[in-house]
Amino acid sequence: MSGADANLARIPEGISDEVAVYCADMLSTGFMGAEHGNIPIGGTVAVLAQGPVGLMATAGARLRGAGLVIGVESVPSRQKLARFYGADVLVDFGKEDVVERIHELTGGQGVDTAIEALGADVTFQTAVKVTKPGGTISVIGYFGQGEFVHIPRVEWGVGMADKTIATGLCPGGRLRMERLLRVLENERVDPTRMTTHRFPFSRMERAFEVSDKKLEDTVKVLVSFDE
């Protein structure tokens, strides 16, 4: 990888490889969602989808001082993890109207920050709809399908609601890695709760299958090279 040495950071004593490896993507991308979200102290945040990146965005929102963190998720095991990482309220999109429920939770105002962590057009539209005027939609999902991503015109304030849309790619660099490791060293967050499956290197193919097909209620798969 070109420039890989620019991302080298010393892993502090006491931090396991399993903990540290989360800095490479999930932790950095999820926290970026909170950072780009301009979350005010005591602000309201909705994190749409509680996969690994969304869970770290939830943790990041709590660390940034959000007063109310709303997690949107339908899978019970991920709802439980969302609670662990800082979601105050869970909204199950399979059972209730997400937009209506979030407006109810925020007194009809909408949230200061909506973090889109799935990468789907419908989720992005929901993020725009639940964000208050002057708020921020922070996008950390990967939109790998479809020709367009649609902005709902009315909820966008017909272009006049001053809703900021922020996007980004997993940030790296030595200083970034050192900051993330400091968060882990001081036990601000424990990403290993997301590790649902462990495989030896000899079973790499099965590890990829479980991860790709989301088998056995998987969240994150760890492959060990200790053989």
Show the residue positions of the predicted features.
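Mid-domain Rossmann-like dinucleotide-binding core that forms the NAD(H)/NADP(H) cofactor-binding site
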Residues: 7-96, 100
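A local structural motif
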Residues: 66-67, 110-112, 188-193
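Glycine- and other small-residue-rich loops at beta-strand/loop junctions that grip anionic moieties
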Residues: 19, 46-50, 71-72, 91, ...
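Rossmann-fold dehydrogenase core element
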Residues: 136, 151-193
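A structural motif shared across PLP-dependent enzymes of the aminotransferase-like
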Residues: 1-3
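Glycine-rich cofactor phosphate-binding loops and adjacent beta1-alpha1 units
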Residues: 36-42, 63-64, 76, 80-164, ...
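C-terminal hydrophobic helical "lid"/dimerization subdomain
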Residues: 125-129, 173-227
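Short beta->alpha linker loops
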Residues: 25, 73-74, 93-97, 118-119, ...
